[in-house]
Amino acid sequence: MRLSDVLILTRARFVSATGSPNLEVRAGFAADLMSDALRYDLSGALLVSGLATPQVVRTAEMADVAAILMVRDKVPPPEALDLAEELGIPFLSTQLTMFETCGRLFAGGLLPCERCNGHK
């Protein structure tokens, strides 16, 4: 799925200067606990979160996430945006809740990530 599809499905917008609507995301994962995110293979994935801190960007960097989508109309602080732009990780935001965001993305064809050990 391309970020352009994510933007349409979730009525999201870019909140960072980094990012192209043509960027492909291979799967999706949602969490506010970043330790949970590190248990899954998020390489090339869309990370959906309500955590608007630099920690989400650091986790995205470690997990090789393709893009971050904030829910509930959250906008990350300047230091998180600066870090994301420095690392080339697009930041998006939607007014939708995490539940509705994930439902729309799944219904639109975005598949979930698998755990790093291969179990679903």
Regions found by a protein language model. Give the residues of each.
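An N-cap/entry alpha-helix motif that binds or orients negatively charged groups
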Residues: M1, D5-F29, R39
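Feature captures the catalytic cores and cofactor-binding loops of soluble hydro-lyases/lyases
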Residues: N22-L23, F29-L46, G50-K120
